[in-house]
């Protein structure tokens, strides 16, 4: 039936495969949990002169953010587990970040309510040890 009102052959309108497909987000395609679309929007809004941002760039930045977050949370969870508590607090985040040399150089920010790392100067330790030895000898 050329030219008449018949069933269309080929094309997107008549294919049954397109109707059965579900939409997948960029995050799902990349196997990520963090939202690629939101990261892309932030990248576009925060660049000078509203520069263009490629889809792959947004996926890459999202993957890096997700990896760093997982790394910090794993170390903070270990710190909380060592202290025998079930909730991660800013103190655990501080201990985790300052305990890892690479994360410490990357994250130089001050963490609110994180406290400080326990550290005693060696010179002070030597004086205390010498006093203990003098008392035990006398």
Swiss-Prot record:
CDD domains hit by this protein: HFD_H2A
Q: Which Gene3D superfamilies does the record associate with it?
A: Histone, subunit A
- Cellular localization per UniProt: Nucleus; Chromosome
* UniProt GO MF annotations: chromatin DNA binding; identical protein binding; protein heterodimerization activity; RNA polymerase II cis-regulatory region sequence-specific DNA binding; structural constituent of chromatin
What the entry lists under SUPFAM superfamilies is as follows: Histone-fold
Q: Which InterPro entries match?
A: Histone-fold, Histone_H2A, Histone_H2A/H2B/H3, Histone_H2A_C
Naming one, the record's GO cellular component terms include: nucleosome
- Compositionally skewed regions (Gly residues) per UniProt: 1-13
Q: Which domain of life is it from?
A: Eukaryota
PTM characteristics: Acetylated once deposited into chromatin.
Q: Which residues form the signal peptide?
A: none
Alphabetized, the UniProt keywords read: Acetylation, Chromosome, DNA-binding, Nucleosome core, Nucleus
N6-acetyllysine occurs at 5, 12
Annotated region described as Disordered, given as residue ranges: 1-32
Q: Report the record's Gene Ontology biological process terms.
A: CENP-A eviction from euchromatin; nuclear-transcribed mRNA catabolic process, non-stop decay; regulation of transcription by RNA polymerase II; silent mating-type cassette heterochromatin formation; transcription elongation by RNA polymerase II
The record's family statement is: Belongs to the histone H2A family.
- Its recorded name reads Histone H2A.Z
Organism lineage string: Eukaryota, Fungi, Dikarya, Ascomycota, Pezizomycotina
């Amino acid at each position: 039936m050329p030219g008449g009102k018949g069933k269309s052959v080929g094309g997107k309108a008549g294919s049954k495969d397109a109707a059965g497909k579900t939409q997948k987000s960029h995050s799902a395609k990349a196997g990520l949990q963090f939202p690629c679309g939101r990261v892309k929007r932030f990248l576009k809004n925060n660049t000078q002169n509203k520069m263009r941002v490629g889809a792959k760039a947004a996926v890459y930045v999202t993957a890096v953010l997700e990896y760093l977050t997982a790394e910090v949370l794993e170390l903070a969870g270990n710190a909380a587990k060592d202290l025998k508590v079930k909730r991660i607090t800013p103190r655990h985040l501080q201990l985790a970040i300052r305990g890892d040399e690479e994360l410490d150089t990357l994250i130089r920010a001050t963490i609110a309510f994180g406290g400080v790392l326990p550290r005693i100067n060696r010179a002070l330790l030597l004086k205390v040890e010498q006093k203990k030895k003098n008392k035990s000898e006398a």
